[in-house]
């Protein structure tokens, strides 16, 4: 067999492994398709629907996310014919993109063997339910797009018109940022690699600088579109939502929830711990020969993998909330370096892979064997989700045209299941409690004789989001209790 034929055979074999990793990611998510949509999924979907029905984004419906995420949810809702449950199919698709992109990055910078192992590892750890890998959250979606941007950038060197490729990588990096503010990891990893190339490799300096400018130009196109929409719909509201609010209430710079970091970190240790150890070995393999490369004025492309872990760690820390799905930001870059480590494991590769994945598979299996009613509770300790669809079903059976529902204080997925546009902007508990003027707006909404909701589904005590007692007073004076669904109490407005 000739050299060309061997290369073709090896490439095909690598694609088989990548396909296996992608299939694993789908199978890992398949059981969770029957679990209720999460608070975030339902909230994003309800806001996207309200926006498509004429509500003004960041005024009538509010979320601390850039517009790109809501555009995606609007598009998916249209394509799916308004199916709420189908949002999990979107999660599967982006999970496949993440696995394939991670493997292609590794193949380009570290070889086919490392790429094969990275695909399998990423297919499992990025889909684990205890890190909410099954849900269509911003970390999974933006991470997949960011990884695709890295693929385009590392492939640019040997391509015709490489600056166009880097421009495209910048576009993808911008799209990742438009989906989630923490989506900068792929973009900054490539820019860091280009800066190092420019600093260490004199012969590559001009090319690296041009490539960086092309990437920033691509990024600039996306940012310009976001800012144009912001200017047309309300610049101050947009800036407050996507930057100002989080900087003041919960980020790495203010209100970081370190207790939650310890709580969710327990699950990350089980699912990502062994992968992180292997990734450390992979990083040593990449970094060890750097001194000789630097002396020769060269910089291996595999350095991108180390930079990716560093930038993803930064993205994880910036959020400040440290929810379980934050850890998904680390799944792909850790898998990439773990693939490098396994490619150097000799005849112990299979044993190492088994040791790597058994903890993640074991805790995922514990979630999967539960009933449909307990899937969300086991996966994310979310006891609201199993009730959201029941509340929505009751509301749809009893409402008349023009009547609406308010969820007190918050359980955003109920709006998505009920196909009910929110009448109050804030759908998450932390915003109801902490957003500027949110409690006064809630009191005005519930007390308005014309706009007040016909039904209120009380998930939390009113005093939890309104310590002043005004909401409690409105419930006593203007509403009557009509039923209970689990622990949720449903009130109807009295004539």
Task: Give the residues covered by each predicted segment.
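Short hydrophobic alpha-helices at membrane interfaces in multi-pass membrane enzymes
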Residues: 155-174, 204-213, 300-310
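Transmembrane-helix motifs of polytopic, lipid-linked glycan transferases
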Residues: 89-110, 117, 124, 148
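Membrane-interface transmembrane helices that cradle and orient dolichyl/undecaprenyl
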Residues: 7, 149-168, 195-202, 274-296, ...
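Perimembrane helix-loop-helix junctions
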Residues: 3-4, 186-220, 284-294, 336
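Short periplasmic/luminal acceptor-recognition loop of GT-C membrane glycosyltransferases, typified by
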Residues: 171, 380-434, 440-467
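Hydrophobic/aromatic-rich transmembrane helices and adjacent perimembrane loops
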Residues: 185, 313, 319-352
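Signature aromatic-anchored transmembrane alpha helix within multi-pass, membrane-resident enzymes
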Residues: 216-220, 343-369
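Membrane-interface alpha helices of multi-pass inner-membrane proteins
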Residues: 26, 164-181, 187-192, 221, ...
């Amino acid at each position: 067999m000739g050299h060309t034929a061997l290369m073709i055979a090896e490439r095909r074999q690598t694609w088989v492994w990548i396909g296996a990793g992608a299939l694993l990611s789908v199978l890992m998510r398949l059981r969770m398709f029957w679990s209720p949509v999460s608070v975030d999924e339902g909230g994003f979907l309800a806001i996207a629907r309200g926006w498509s029905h004429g509500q003004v984004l960041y005024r009538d419906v509010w979320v601390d996310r850039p517009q790109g995420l809501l555009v995606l949810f609007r598009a998916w809702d249209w394509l799916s014919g308004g199916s709420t449950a189908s949002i999990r199919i979107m999660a599967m698709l982006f999970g496949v993109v993440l696995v394939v992109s991670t493997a292609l990055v590794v193949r380009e910078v570290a070889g086919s063997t490392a790429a094969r192992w990275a695909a399998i590892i990423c297919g499992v750890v990025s889909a684990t339910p205890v890190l909410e890998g099954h849900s269509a959250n911003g970390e999974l979606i933006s991470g997949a797009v960011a990884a695709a941007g890295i693929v385009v950038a590392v492939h640019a060197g040997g391509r015709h018109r490489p600056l166009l490729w880097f421009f495209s990588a910048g576009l993808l990096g911008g799209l990742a940022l438009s989906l989630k503010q923490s989506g900068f990891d792929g973009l900054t990893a490539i820019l860091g690699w280009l800066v190092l190339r420019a600093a260490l490799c004199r012969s590559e300096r001009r090319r690296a600088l041009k490539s960086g400018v092309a990437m920033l130009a691509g990024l600039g196109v996306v940012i310009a579109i976001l800012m144009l929409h912001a200017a047309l719909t309300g610049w101050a509201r947009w800036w407050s939502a996507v930057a100002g609010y989080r900087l003041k209430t919960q980020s790495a710079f203010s209100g970081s929830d370190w207790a939650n970091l310890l709580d969710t970190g327990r699950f990350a240790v089980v699912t990502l711990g062994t992968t992180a150890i292997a990734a450390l070995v992979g990083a040593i393999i990449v970094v060890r020969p750097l001194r000789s490369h630097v002396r020769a004025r060269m910089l291996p492309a595999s350095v991108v993998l180390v930079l990716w872990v560093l930038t993803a760690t930064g993205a994880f820390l910036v959020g400040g909330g440290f929810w379980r799905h934050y850890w998904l930001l680390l799944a792909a870059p850790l898998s990439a370096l773990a693939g490098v480590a396994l490619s150097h494991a000799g005849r112990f590769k299979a044993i190492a892979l088994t040791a790597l994945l058994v903890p993640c598979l074991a805790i995922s299996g514990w979630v999967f064997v539960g009933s449909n009613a307990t899937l969300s509770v086991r996966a994310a300790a979310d006891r609201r989700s199993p009730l959201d669809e029941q509340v929505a079903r009751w509301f749809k059976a009893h409402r008349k045209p023009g009547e609406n529902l308010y969820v007190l204080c918050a359980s955003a997925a109920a709006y998505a299941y009920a196909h009910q546009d929110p009448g109050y902007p804030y759908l998450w508990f932390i915003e109801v409690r902490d957003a500027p003027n949110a409690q006064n707006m809630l009191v005005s909404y519930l007390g308005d004789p014309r706009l007040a909701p016909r039904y209120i589904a009380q998930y939390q005590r009113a005093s939890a989001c309104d310590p002043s007692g005004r909401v409690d007073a409105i419930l006593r004076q203007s509403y009557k209790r009509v039923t209970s669904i689990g622990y949720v109490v449903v009130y109807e407005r009295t004539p």
